[in-house]
């Protein structure tokens, strides 16, 4: 009884020693994720992505990505692989059962006249079971579980990132389309102005300078179109790659037709952010795997006790084979004798590996809060910027209308009209970019809060 108590005490100390040396992460959560935003349990990340991105064409692209993206399929296969490996480790708890049989025929006194023949027949079942006194198998199983969960959470994080990447590329593509429409329409206006300037010059109404100015404006606008078309095609190829398809034309809406699904900033509680972000959960499981690896290294310093059981039949001929049962049991104790500190060094190294992983986990948490704060700043700024750009565009349009009227009345020169046209073109493009940035800021906020991987 005393020996049993001593053994149990040693086992308990083994587990405590590992947990004592594997220090918990130093994480102190703030009262609010963002100081300027009141803490609330409601969070935009809890909304399914299909309710955020309501455009059917964008939804189709996201669904294709979730079904066909090669990185996501690779991650899924990896999760399934680790699930199978976990079953292998779990099987170490069970006894290993085997079977063997043989027929042995020996001839003795080969050079003599009285040769003898010996026949031996056997059929046996074997059973080997390791008694996990010091938790070696238990720690190995914990490591396998943690690695599996780490990969599963990593798959969720990848899905979250891919949804954000597809949506971002989609809005960038729509913004490029809109910019191309603006410039194409401006080019038509420049062509009309060039025709009018040519007629005035040829009719002797003006000098050649206004005509040349009109040509410069037309050419400087026309040269923008090929560059935009190139950007559009490259962006389409980028989206096709994300969806797991060959380069193709991407069906999309017009950016001015799109409406945000939300108009309030709901960012939730700090504690919920830790739970919601799959990349943080993945880092946590990675930390647990390192602890389990340290526990395994600790258990490796102690003896392994294996019980071997063998039973069956063995005889010198077939006639009495089933009347000759055979059984025996062996308890095998294997222990390191002289390792010259190798196992202790391996355990110490595993502890240091845990510490390094702990610092990475703490960094991941800090990074998550930083990303949310940056996303909130960007979202607020982008909304204000879009409002200001709308006002700027309206003012530039009014300026252009007045300049055209005054030029017709001979009150200002043609160069003043050109200046007003440039201001309006720039204002239109800047507004288009501001609307794009507003949508992208929402996507980044949604992603930083951990939205996108949740199932309906």
Spans of features found by a protein language model:
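Bacterial Sec-pathway N-terminal export signals of envelope proteins
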Residues: 16-85, 258-286, 336-337
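Short segments within alpha-helical structural elements
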Residues: 191, 220-248, 382, 390-449
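Sec-dependent N-terminal signal peptides
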Residues: 4-12
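Amphipathic alpha-helical coiled-coil segments and their boundaries
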Residues: 68, 75, 130, 137, ...
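Small/polar, glycine/serine/threonine/aspartate-rich low-complexity segments that form flexible
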Residues: 36-54, 63, 101-126, 249-266, ...
């Amino acid at each position: 009884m005393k020996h049993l108590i001593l053994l149990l005490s040693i086992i308990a100390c083994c587990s405590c020693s590992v947990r004592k040396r594997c220090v918990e992460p130093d994480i102190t959560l703030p009262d609010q994720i963002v100081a300027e935003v009141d803490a609330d349990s409601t969070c935009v990340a809890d909304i399914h992505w299909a309710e955020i991105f309501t455009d059917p064409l964008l939804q189709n692209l996201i669904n294709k990505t979730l079904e066909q993206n090669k990185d996501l399929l690779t991650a899924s296969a990896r999760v399934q692989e680790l699930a199978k490996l976990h079953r292998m480790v779990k099987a170490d708890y069970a006894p290993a059962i085997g079977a063997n049989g043989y027929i042995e025929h020996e001839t003795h006194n080969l050079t003599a006249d009285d040769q003898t023949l010996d026949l031996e027949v056997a059929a046996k079942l074997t059973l080997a079971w390791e008694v996990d006194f010091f938790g070696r198998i238990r720690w190995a199983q914990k490591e396998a579980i943690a690695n599996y969960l780490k990969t599963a959470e990593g798959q969720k994080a990848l899905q979250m990132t891919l949804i954000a990447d597809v949506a971002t590329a989609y809005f960038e593509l729509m913004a490029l389309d809109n910019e191309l429409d603006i410039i194409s329409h401006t080019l038509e206006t420049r062509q009309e102005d060039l025709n009018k300037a040519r007629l005035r010059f040829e009719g002797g109404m003006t000098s050649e300078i206004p005509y040349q100015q009109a040509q410069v404006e037309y050419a400087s606008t026309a040269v923008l179109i090929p560059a935009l078309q190139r950007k559009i095609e490259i962006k389409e190829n980028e989206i096709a790659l994300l969806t797991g398809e060959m380069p193709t034309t991407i069906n999309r809406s017009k950016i001015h037709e799109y409406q945000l699904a939300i108009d309030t900033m709901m960012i939730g509680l700090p504690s919920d952010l830790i739970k919601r972000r799959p990349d943080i959960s993945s880092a946590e499981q990675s930390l647990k795997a390192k602890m389990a690896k340290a526990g395994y290294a600790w258990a490796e310093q102690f003896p392994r006790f294996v019980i071997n059981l063998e039973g069956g039949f063995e005889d010198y001929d077939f006639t009495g084979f089933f009347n000759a049962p055979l059984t025996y049991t062996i308890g095998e104790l294997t222990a390191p004798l002289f390792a010259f500190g190798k196992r202790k060094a391996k355990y110490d190294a595993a502890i240091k590996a845990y510490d390094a992983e702990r610092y990475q986990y703490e960094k991941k948490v800090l990074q998550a809060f930083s990303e949310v704060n940056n996303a909130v700043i960007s979202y607020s700024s982008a909304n204000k910027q879009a409002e200001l750009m709308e006002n700027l565009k309206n003012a530039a349009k009014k300026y252009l209308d007045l300049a055209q009227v005054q030029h017709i009345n001979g009150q200002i020169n043609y160069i003043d009209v050109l200046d007003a046209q440039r201001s309006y073109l720039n204002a239109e493009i800047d507004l288009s970019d501001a609307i794009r940035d507003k949508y992208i800021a929402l996507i980044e906020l949604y992603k930083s809060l951990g939205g996108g991987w949740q199932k309906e």
